[in-house]
Amino acid sequence: MKILVIQQKMIGDVLTSSILFEALRAKYPNAQLDYLVNSHTVPVIENNPNIDNLVLFTNEEESSKLALLKFAKKIKKQQYDVVIDVYSKLSSNLITLFSAAKTKISYYKSYSSFIYTHNIKRATKTDENCGLAIVNRLQLLKPLDITIASAKPKIYLTSEELETSKQFLTTNGINLKMPLIMISVLGSGENKTYPFAYMAKVIDQIVATTEAQILFNYIPKQEKEAKAIFNLCKAETQAHIYMHLFGKSLRDFLNLTAHCHALIGNEGGAVNMAKALNIKTFTIFSTWIDKDTWNIFEEETINESVHLKDYKPELYSGKTEKEMKPQAMKLYKKFTPELFQQKLDAFLIKI
């Protein structure tokens, strides 16, 4: 049997959807399990023992209809028995359609339902602490008679990687016996990034409470923005921030985060990666993102999160995520650090 799981686009999505492979491997130990992902997301699923092959979706297929068509025809030649389309967008619709698999599973959408043999309606509520992002993905396994209530993404780092990153930190002045906290200072876009002045206040609070060593999660092209947040911090806070120590690649970031006591900051892929490494997290949600979907494995003092809706629910009454998105920046101004100062302190003293 050959099974293809499709999850394009974001790193956090690719990591989250990787939970399907452990369940598929348990059900079909001898099957060929392949994962179709964007090439830049590979580091979060590297060394996963349940994935046989990675099928890489590149910028060429992303930007060219002709390249996408050729790619879909290549998938058809693989003769998959089952295709699970988690992404469920136009490109993956086309790939699934061309696959000619006997079993084709995805989320229900009126315009694409004819492509799939099984169309699964997303749950809108759950009592599971794993969150809706996990619950809805696991529902895609039901047509294969696989029923699981919860599953947690895992990242597989080698002992060599961990030792190399440990030496990198210690030779650059980090004391691993003292608290080390990674700050997700920037979101994936402006409307997913906590205002710089507010983030600086959060970092000030973290250092004042814990005297922790601070690392920033950013890539070289984001140095200007990261430095701007650094400059807004108090002088005594700046003395605790190791600006020059950052992951120059996604895999480097994972290895550095594995040595941290917590990751705190903007919701996004970095938070999901930290959770997959069993690192404590405190997440600040964008004002327009649905917290119920992405606050996976919420647990007091372990994985906590805050959203403006927690403190000012009247601003969201009867409004959809789509309606809130254009107001994101205006809403951020109302989402002051003082609103969750007490909750953050309670989290910090448990590190």
Provide a role label for each language-model segment.
Residues 1-351:
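Catalytic machinery of carbohydrate-active enzymes
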